[in-house]
Amino acid sequence: MKTGIHPNYAEITATCTCGNIIKVNSTAGKNLHLDVCGACHPFYTGTQKVVDTGGRIDKFNKRFGMLGKK
């Protein structure tokens, strides 16, 4: 490997809005601010919401359902 061509590899901190602090190695060289992390993401915490699209389907069938029936 050639010397002097590789970027500096330093430890930085990634801070989440929930207060979780993660130390990682990076070539970016500056600290990161995250919106979500593994500690507060809805998928990992089990608090994810199910999107109910039933209202949209009912609205469609109400408007166009009679066209499919003979």
From Swiss-Prot:
GO terms for cellular component: ribonucleoprotein complex; ribosome. Part of the 50S ribosomal subunit. GO terms for molecular function: metal ion binding; rRNA binding; structural constituent of ribosome. Keywords: Metal-binding, Ribonucleoprotein, Ribosomal protein, RNA-binding, rRNA-binding, Zinc. Its cofactor is Zn(2+). GO terms for biological process: translation. Binds the 23S rRNA. Zn(2+) binds at C16, C18, C37, C40. Belongs to the bacterial ribosomal protein bL31 family. Type A subfamily. The gene is rpmE. Pfam families: Ribosomal_L31. This is Large ribosomal subunit protein bL31. Gene3D superfamilies: Ribosomal protein L31 (4.10.830.30). Binds 1 zinc ion per subunit.
